[in-house]
Curated annotation (Swiss-Prot):
It is found in: Virion; Host nucleus; Host early endosome; Host Golgi apparatus. Minor protein of the capsid that localizes along the inner surface of the virion, within the central cavities beneath the L1 pentamers. Plays a role in capsid stabilization through interaction with the major capsid protein L1. Once the virion enters the host cell, L2 escorts the genomic DNA into the nucleus by promoting escape from the endosomal compartments and traffic through the host Golgi network. Highly phosphorylated. It holds the Pfam family Late_protein_L2. It comes from Human papillomavirus type 5b. The gene is L2. The keyword Nucleotide-binding does not apply. Keywords: Capsid protein, Cytoplasmic inwards viral transport, Disulfide bond, DNA-binding, Host endosome, Host Golgi apparatus, Host nucleus, Host-virus interaction, Late protein, Microtubular inwards viral transport, Phosphoprotein, Viral penetration into host nucleus, Virion, Virus entry into host cell. The keyword Iron does not apply. This is Minor capsid protein L2. Interacts with major capsid protein L1. Interacts with E2; this interaction inhibits E2 transcriptional activity but not the DNA replication function E2. Interacts with host GADD45GIP1. Interacts with host HSPA8; this interaction is required for L2 nuclear translocation. Interacts with host importins KPNB2 and KPNB3. Forms a complex with importin alpha2-beta1 heterodimers via interaction with the importin alpha2 adapter. Interacts with host DYNLT1; this interaction is essential for virus intracellular transport during entry. Belongs to the papillomaviridae L2 protein family. Disulfide bonds join 19-25.
Length: 518
């Protein structure tokens, strides 16, 4: 009888992770993971009273802890596998402790029969107040000669003393003007005056107005002097036009990349020229070489290398990119016709040798976009705060004054010669040809209103039938007119549905032939 193979149980950690949520864990798994076994409890509660931290238990080194293995009743032990070392301090340690104890006074020894009561003596407490401060007075001698602002004392015999007190000198008044300036790199004050009437200084506007800004007729004739405009310093700055661009990164002639050893992208003898019309050539040219997924993070602005297996033939999305192994970064230039050209140099891997080398021709893929025109010069305005740009218009100054006599009114006679009836409007409104429009004039829908035969002659004009219809009931005593019916029978067709079929009248249906059955 074959013995059954023992299947090893899974690890305790993995079993605990899977069965803890379900509550089906074995007791031994829970005790081992949560450290609640008998040995764990002995270590937990026994470590409160016994410390075995320096013995190196369960370290696997066999050194016996910090003191080594010591037999009972002997001195310090020796570590296994090592020689004892004597540790000597480099400096002599100084004794740290209290001050030396003074000897007991033996002059007045205490007799054994003396009283043990010690009399109290008065002692002066510690003086906590500050001590006396020494004061030093500096005495300055009086100058011998007369000094400024010194009182003069005059003494005379037989009269009262007169004391002349000099007035107290008034110190000079100091006026301090401060101006705070905060530096703002985006704001710059231009201290400039444009040719205008007035004055300017820094950022403070000073406006000078006068009453000679208008035009006076009939007054004194003054001499008119032609003034010339004072050009500012910005007038002499001539901005040269931007030269037309020929490539995306213009390089000097001595650093030209495409001219070394006669190599050029437009050389038809060395490079195959292929014009691409697909717009993916500008953004994602790799989609023209092989089918791939979109990666919005990757920008195809570098050289793309495609690793294809030559044993397996894969049809590319575009036949012009067949067997392309490398597609370099784009280059921007201009054509002789003035168009922008995006070029990429590619390498084909058409032939592979036995050593693994791949041989292929070089292809110039390009697409012409548009032309690059020279920018028109734009007049730039000054940035910052400067005076002279604001135009202030005053009504009384800019008006025209006429010198005339107000007492005489030459128009009074001509006004009285005409009557007020000439101001009345004599136009006659005629509404005979008008029409009543119901609805909105902006509606573009056309509705056909059927015209019924009636004895009343009237015209209806309806422009929009989406409004409201108001019907007013009327009663007339008109005789009802009965029109004679024609001789042709009337065919009635019921059109209950809007399909393409119809129902015939029962009189028009084909009658069934009656037959008698024997």
């Amino acid at each position: 009888m074959a013995r059954a193979k023992r299947v090893k149980r899974d690890s305790v950690t993995h079993i605990y992770q899977t069965c803890k949520q379900a509550g089906t864990c074995p007791p031994d798994v829970i005790n081992k993971v949560e450290q609640t076994t008998v040995a764990d409890n002995i270590l937990k509660y026994g470590s409160a009273g016994v410390f075995f931290g320096g013995l190196g238990i369960s370290t696997g080194r066999g050194t016996g802890g910090a003191t080594g293995y010591v037999p009972l009743g002997e001195g310090p032990g020796v570590r296994v596998g090592g020689t004892p070392t004597v540790v000597r301090p480099s400096l002599v340690p100084e004794t740290v402790g209290p001050v030396d104890i003074l000897p007991i006074d033996t002059v007045n020894p205490v007799e054994p029969t003396a009283s043990s009561v010690v009399p109290l003596t008065e002692s002066t407490g510690a003086d906590l107040l500050p001590g006396e401060v020494e004061t030093i007075a500096e005495i300055h001698p009086v100058p011998e000669g007369p000094s400024v602002d010194t009182p003069v004392v005059t003494t005379s015999t037989g009269s009262s003393a007169v004391l002349e007190v000099a007035p107290e000198p008034i110190p000079p008044t100091r006026v301090r003007v401060s101006r705070t300036h905060y530096h703002n790199p985006s704001f710059q004050i231009i201290t400039e005056s444009t040719p205008a009437q007035g004055e300017s200084s820094l950022a403070d506007h000073v406006l000078v107005t006068s009453g000679s800004g208008g035009q006076q007729i009939g007054g004194d004739i003054t001499d008119i002097i032609e003034l010339e405009e004072i050009p500012s310093r910005y007038t002499f700055e001539i901005e040269e036009p931007t030269p037309p661009r020929r490539s995306s990164t213009p390089l000097p002639r001595n650093q030209s990349v495409g001219r070394r050893r006669g190599f050029s992208l437009t050389n038809r003898r060395l490079v195959q020229q292929v014009q691409v019309d697909n717009p993916l050539f500008l953004t994602q040219p790799s989609k023209l070489v092989r089918f791939a997924f979109d990666n919005p993070v990757f920008e195809e602005e570098v050289t793309n290398i495609f690793e294809n297996d030559l044993d397996v033939f894969e049809e590319p999305p575009d036949r012009d990119f067949l067997d392309v192994r490398e597609l370099r970064r784009p280059q921007y230039s201009t054509t002789p016709a003035g168009y922008v050209r995006v070029s990429r140099l590619g390498t084909r891997a058409t032939i592979r040798t036995r050593s693994g080398a791949q041989i292929g021709s070089q292809v110039h893929f390009y697409r012409d976009l548009s032309s690059i025109n020279t920018e028109d010069p734009i007049e730039l305005q000054l940035l910052g705060q400067h005076s002279g740009d604001a135009t202030i218009v005053q009504g009384p100054v800019e008006s025209t004054f006429i010198d005339m006599d107000i007492s005489e009114n030459p128009l009074s006679e001509s006004i009285e010669a005409y009557s007020h009836d000439l101001l009345l409007d004599e136009a006659v409104e005629d509404f005979s040809g008008s029409q009543l429009v119901i609805g909105n004039r902006r509606s573009t829908n056309s509705y056909t209103v059927p015209r019924f035969e009636t004895t009343r002659n009237g015209s209806y004009y309806t422009q929009d039938t989406k409004g409201y219809y108001v019907a007013y009931p009327e009663s007339r005593n008109n005789a009802e007119i009965i029109y004679p019916t024609p001789d042709i029978p009337v065919v009635i067709i019921h059109t209950h549905d809007n399909t393409g079929d119809f129902y015939l009248h029962p009189s028009l249906r084909r009658r069934k032939r009656k037959r008698k059955y024997l």
